[in-house]
Structures are given as structure tokens and as C-alpha cells.
């Protein structure tokens, strides 16, 4: 994704492109074929074949509507693609299925209680497709006549509109005249008018006017003149989440809170009434419930009260699929004194189906770094890519991925568009990975403030520097 920003140092105020590249912006799906078999490298996903195959089964069940109120735990070491798996699932589901991503630490807030924050996250992940029949007037504009008063008072007008089979003249009031003026509707445009709201939508320009000698923009779209009756009934489907309905009904002008984010605590009575109404709409065929996915990253950060709430919420009538990710092994459950696998209570683990991820091999790391370099528009020499791959295997994939953009800046400093081995080595020396940083702190721990607030102030100013070439040879 790129946006245009102005350069403050440029007196001419020229615009430059700013690329917004996230850690998982290169992922467009799970990389599966029609039989749910994972490809080695596809749609930005590399390796983790068993985990992607399992996620593909979950994807198919979600699309068929045969799974809801289930808990899925993705467990594995750091930098093994757990969040990437969730993002791939989100992209594969498409826009029609709600997908809400939060982290475990987001639940704790001074404004909202833990249960309220979780409830809102749950209800954001449940979509409601509401069907509505509307009457539309669709046709090609033949002529627009607008009579304006000299004193600037009431305006009157006539709109002549036609299809291939009929032609009609409509009287226009102030609101319709303003709408036509706002949309810049001219003779030859194909428009759609919602009779209930008076909303005017410009569909395009008629093919009959395509040969007219007239100035038009590059985005002008030519469409066929509509056939049949002018007035048509059309079924429109609106997709909203349960949380949006909650906010709108929780207070006067509640829809404004959707934009400000100041939702506050929503009373349970409001939610009960909405649940009853949605159930009625479902029985009458007016609405369809779409169970979505709630992804909780770093789920081990939740405490025992949150886990207890999730256990109960999974059994609710309106429950989404909960996907959780953690990199913990046997660790203490927050809010308790006992240890459990992945830092989760055993009763929640019993309710979950668990997907495991494993460390990437060298070839997979190389493929991922190649994809990241393409996403960041960085040209790597083969030797530099091999060195980054080796660094990723010895340190971590995240560290090696971060070195790509740093090494690019070093290469640009010497006026080169290609990142060479020397650029990667300089970046490696400038920025420590976690293991070298830990060793540096251990060797100089007397100079840091400890738990008791004690520190040894050195007057010589000498500190042990981290070893430069422990993971690679940095000599040029």
C-alpha cells in the first residue's frame, strides 16, 4: 500500500510516495489448491504444510457454515508463522465473513471491563446479512429541465428518463434537483434512483452517446441502456456485525460512536433484545447469521477470568470461531499459581483443536526473504540473499527480515540500487540480534540498574563491546 505525502524540505511542495508495508502484507491466502493440498510456496505462504492443510479444513468448514463456537489453538515457537497463518485464513475467507484480530493485552483497559472488551470482540465477529427489498427507477436520462426562481426560492424541474421499451417524465422537487446537481447528471447518463431514500447513483454513460464529440475523463464508464420497466424491485443485502447493531441501539445517536470508537459499556438488556430480534429475522427469512473468526494473538496474556468467560461464551447461540495463537510451552496461567501447557487452563485446551507449527528450514527461510525483498522493492544480490538466509537460520527470521530494509539504506548511501554482502555485514554490525544483545547485557550487567535499583557508575567509560563476528565473518 502506498500513499502520497508532501516533502517539507521541498520548496515546490512536490509529492512523494510513502510505502506502508506491514509484516504480513505479502500474504494473500493460505496457498492451497482446490483439494486443500498446500503448495510449497503460494500466495505469500511458505512451508508449514501440515498447519496450512489443517487451516484449509477449517476454512472449508467455515465456508460451508458447519462450524461455529469452536476454539482453535495455533501453537509453535516464535517466528514460525502463527500470525501469518491467521492472516492467510482471513484473506481466504474474503470480505463477506467477519474477521476480528486482537492481542491478549488489548483486553485490559481502564475504560472497559475485561468481559465487556471480550464480548465486544465476540460480537464484532458475528455478521448479519439483512435482506431488504427496494424500489428503484433505472434508465437513461433524455432531458433535464430545471426552472430556478429569480429570487432564489423554490426550484422546479422535469426529468425525462427512458429504457429501451418506455419513456417517462417525472416532476422534480428541491431534494431531487440538488441530488442531480451533486452527481453532475447530464443527458445520456444512466442513473438509478432509490424511491425510498431518493438516493441517486450514476451507473455510467449510455453506449448511444459513445460517439459524441464531448470531453470526458479517463474513468468514464459506458453501459447499456436498461431494458423493460423503469420501476424495478431489487433485493439489497446489507452486512453488519452484531456489535454495530449494539452500538447504534445503546444510546441516542449511537451510530456516531461507530466512528469515534467511544462505545463504552453496553447493557446486557440491549444485547438480549437485539438477540431476540435477530432470531425473529432469521425465522422470517429476513436475515442470515454469518459466524466469523475472532483471532486472539498472544492468548497466554489473558488471565483465568478471561479464560473462564471464553469457556462460557463458546457455548452461546451467537458464537464465532475463536482462533488463538501462543508461543508458550509449559508456563504459568496468569492469575493462578499452577502451570499448564501453553499457559492455558486444561478445560479450555480440552475444548480446542490444536494446530502446531515448526521451525523453517534454510530453503524456506530463503524463499520467505525473497518474497519480503520483492514486497519491499529491494534488489538483493545472490550472495547477500545467501548471507541473510544464513543469518536467519542462526538468529531469527524476523531479525533477518528486518535487515533487508536496513541494508538497502546502506546500499543507497553508496549510490547503489543492489544490496551486496558488504551492506548486509554493516547492517549486522550496527544492529544486534537478541542472542548478541543478551550476551552484551550479561557481560556489562554491573553497569545496568538491577532489581534493587543498584548500579555501578564507571568513570572510565569502558564497556565490553559485543563480539562483531561470532555469527559470520565480517571482514571485507
From Swiss-Prot:
Q: Which GO terms describe its cellular component?
A: Ino80 complex; R2TP complex; Swr1 complex
Q: Which domain of life is it from?
A: Eukaryota
The answer to keyword rRNA processing applying to this record is yes
Recall the GO molecular function terms of this protein's record: 3'-5' DNA helicase activity; 5'-3' DNA helicase activity; ATP binding; ATP hydrolysis activity
Q: Does the keyword Nucleus apply?
A: yes
Which reaction is recorded as catalysed by this protein? ATP + H2O = ADP + phosphate + H(+)
What are its E.C. numbers?
3.6.4.12
SUPFAM superfamilies assigned to the protein according to its UniProt record, in alphabetical order: P-loop containing nucleoside triphosphate hydrolases
The positions annotated for binding ATP are 76-83
> Which key words tag this protein in UniProt?
Activator, ATP-binding, Chromatin regulator, DNA damage, DNA repair, Helicase, Hydrolase, Nucleotide-binding, Nucleus, rRNA processing, Transcription, Transcription regulation
Alphabetized InterPro entries for the sequence: AAA+_ATPase, P-loop_NTPase, RuvB-like, RuvB-like_C, RuvBL1/2_DNA/RNA_bd_dom, TIP49_P-loop
A Pfam family of this chain: TIP49_C
Q: Where in the cell is it found?
A: Nucleus
Give GO BP annotations, semicolon-separated: box C/D snoRNP assembly; chromatin remodeling; DNA repair; regulation of transcription by RNA polymerase II; rRNA processing
Primary residence:
nucleus
Relate the assembly described in the record.
Answer: May form heterododecamers with RVB1. Component of the SWR1 chromatin remodeling complex, the INO80 chromatin remodeling complex, and of the R2TP complex.
Query: What family name appears in the similarity comment?
Result: Belongs to the RuvB family.
Instruction: Say what the protein does.
Output: DNA helicase which participates in several chromatin remodeling complexes, including the SWR1 and the INO80 complexes. The SWR1 complex mediates the ATP-dependent exchange of histone H2A for the H2A variant HZT1 leading to transcriptional regulation of selected genes by chromatin remodeling. The INO80 complex remodels chromatin by shifting nucleosomes and is involved in DNA repair. Also involved in pre-rRNA processing.
Protein name, entry field: RuvB-like helicase 2
What gene is this protein a product of? RVB2
Amino acid at each position: 500500500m502506498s500513499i502520497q505525502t508532501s516533502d517539507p524540505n521541498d520548496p515546490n511542495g512536490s509529492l512523494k510516495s510513502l510505502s506502508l508495508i506491514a509484516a504480513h502484507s505479502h500474504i494473500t491466502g493460505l496457498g492451497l489448491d482446490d483439494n486443500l493440498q498446500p503448495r510449497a510456496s503460494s500466495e505469500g505462504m511458505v512451508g508449514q504444510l501440515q498447519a496450512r492443510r489443517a487451516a484449509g479444513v477449517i476454512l472449508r468448514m467455515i465456508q460451508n457454515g458447519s462450524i461455529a463456537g469452536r476454539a482453535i489453538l495455533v501453537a509453535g515457537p516464535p517466528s514460525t508463522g502463527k500470525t501469518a497463518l491467521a492472516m492467510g485464513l482471513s484473506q481466504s475467507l474474503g470480505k463477506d465473513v467477519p474477521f476480528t484480530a486482537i492481542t491478549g493485552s488489548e483486553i485490559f483497559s481502564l475504560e472497559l471491563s475485561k468481559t465487556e472488551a471480550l464480548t465486544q470482540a465476540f460480537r464484532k465477529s458475528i455478521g448479519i446479512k439483512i435482506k431488504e427489498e427496494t424500489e428503484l427507477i433505472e434508465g437513461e436520462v433524455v432531458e433535464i429541465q430545471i426552472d430556478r426562481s429569480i429570487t432564489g426560492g423554490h426550484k422546479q424541474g422535469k426529468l425525462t428518463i427512458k429504457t429501451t421499451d418506455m419513456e417517462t417524465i417525472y416532476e422534480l422537487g428541491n431534494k431531487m434537483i440538488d441530488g442531480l446537481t451533486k452527481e453532475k447528471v447530464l443527458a445520456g447518463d444512466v442513473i438509478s434512483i432509490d424511491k425510498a431514500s431518493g438516493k441517486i447513483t450514476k451507473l455510467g454513460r449510455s453506449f448511444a452517446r459513445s460517439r459524441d464529440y464531448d470531453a470526458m475523463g479517463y474513468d468514464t464508464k459506458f453501459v447499456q441502456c436498461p431494458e423493460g420497466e423503469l420501476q424495478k424491485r431489487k433485493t439489497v443485502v446489507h452486512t453488519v456485525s452484531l456489535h454495530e447493531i449494539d452500538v447504534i441501539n445503546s444510546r441516542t445517536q449511537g451510530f456516531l460512536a461507530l466512528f469515534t470508537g467511544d462505545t463504552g459499556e453496553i447493557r446486557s438488556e440491549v444485547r438480549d433484545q437485539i438477540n431476540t430480534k435477530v432470531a425473529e429475522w432469521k425465522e422470517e427469512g429476513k436475515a442470515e447469521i454469518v459466524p466469523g473468526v475472532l483471532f486472539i494473538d498472544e492468548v497466554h496474556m489473558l488471565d483465568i477470568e478471561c479464560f473462564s468467560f471464553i469457556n462460557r461464551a463458546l457455548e452461546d447461540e451467537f458464537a464465532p470461531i475463536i482462533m488463538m495463537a501462543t508461543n508458550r510451552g509449559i508456563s504459568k496461567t496468569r492469575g493462578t499459581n499452577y502451570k499448564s501447557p501453553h499457559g492455558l487452563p486444561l478445560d479450555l485446551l480440552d475444548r480446542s483443536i490444536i494446530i502446531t507449527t515448526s521451525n523453517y528450514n534454510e530453503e524456506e527461510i530463503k524463499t520467505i526473504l525473497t518474497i519480503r525483498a520483492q514486497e519491499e522493492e529491494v534488489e538483493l544480490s545472490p550472495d547477500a540473499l545467501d548471507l541473510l538466509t544464513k543469518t536467519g537460520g542462526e538468529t531469527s527470521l524476523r531479525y533477518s527480515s528486518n535487515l533487508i530494509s536496513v541494508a538497502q539504506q546502506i546500499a543507497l548511501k553508496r549510490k547503489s540500487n543492489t544490496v551486496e554482502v558488504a551492506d548486509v555485514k554493516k547492517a549486522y554490525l550496527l544492529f544486534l540480534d537478541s542472542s548478541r544483545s543478551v550476551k552484551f547485557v550479561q557481560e556489562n550487567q554491573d553497569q545496568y540498574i538491577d532489581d534493587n535499583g543498584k548500579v555501578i557508575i564507571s568513570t572510565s567509560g569502558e564497556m565490553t563491546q559485543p563480539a562483531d563476528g561470532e555469527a559470520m565473518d565480517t571482514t571485507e
